[in-house]
Design a protein with these regions (language model features):
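Short loop segments at secondary-structure junctions
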Residues: 17-19, 26, 91-96, 116-118
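A short coil-to-beta-strand element that immediately follows conserved catalytic motifs
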Residues: 62-70
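Active-site-adjacent beta-strand/loop module that shapes the phosphate/pyrophosphate-binding cleft
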Residues: 74-98, 112, 133
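A generic structural micro-feature
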Residues: 2-6, 33, 78-84, 103-108
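Conserved Nudix-box catalytic region and its N-terminal flanking loop in Nudix hydrolases
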Residues: 16-57, 61
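Conserved N-terminal beta-strand and adjoining loop/helix that marks the start
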Residues: 1-21, 71, 89
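Residues that recognize and position ribonucleotide moieties
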Residues: 6, 13, 34, 61, ...
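Nudix hydrolase/Nudix homology domain
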Residues: 29-34, 103-148
Length: 148
């Protein structure tokens, strides 16, 4: 099987009043999987610039980008998909994450703030998300199968 080159993406961890911002980026609610906001990297832009753009597209919020905190890899073992996500800690510059918001592109179906306890009852990726978001440090999650 011919494998495609890995897709590079960036994601941001935003904590507001000790709650983590997550999104469901599955149009029409095809999945209940939640993740940190972000998306694919465009050539010619820095990772932080890509994250600022993608975070705004998925949440309507403007952020500042801090230090990287995680490199996470996932793939489809039966296909050619392989993605590498670089996570950064981010801060809120503008916008209200608690206000109702609708994605004008219809990709993000949910944007919500969750506590660490609430996160334990949700389907999220990566598995180490709580540890990374609340405990600090820098992490690497080895290649894991994609969830849908």
């Amino acid at each position: 099987m011919i494998r495609a080159r890995p897709r590079l993406a960036v994601r941001g961890l935003l904590l507001i009043e000790n709650r983590l911002l997550l999104v469901n980026a599955w149009p029409d609610g095809k999945s209940d999987l939640l993740c940190a906001p972000g998306g694919g990297v465009e050539a010619g832009s820095s990772l932080p610039d890509n994250l600022i753009r993608e975070f705004h597209e998925e949440t309507g919020l403007t952020i500042s980008v801090g230090e990287p905190c995680l490199v996470n890899e996932f793939h489809d073992p039966e296909g050619s998909f392989h993605q590498v996500d670089v996570y950064f800690r981010v801060g809120l510059i503008a916008g209200d994450p608690m206000a109702p918001w609708t994605d004008p592109e219809g990709v993000v179906t949910e944007r919500r703030l969750v506590t660490r306890d609430e996160l334990a009852d949700l389907r999220v990726k990566p598995d180490s998300l709580a540890e990374i978001a609340w405990d600090g440090g820098i992490f690497y999650d080895p290649l894991e199968p994609i969830l849908r």
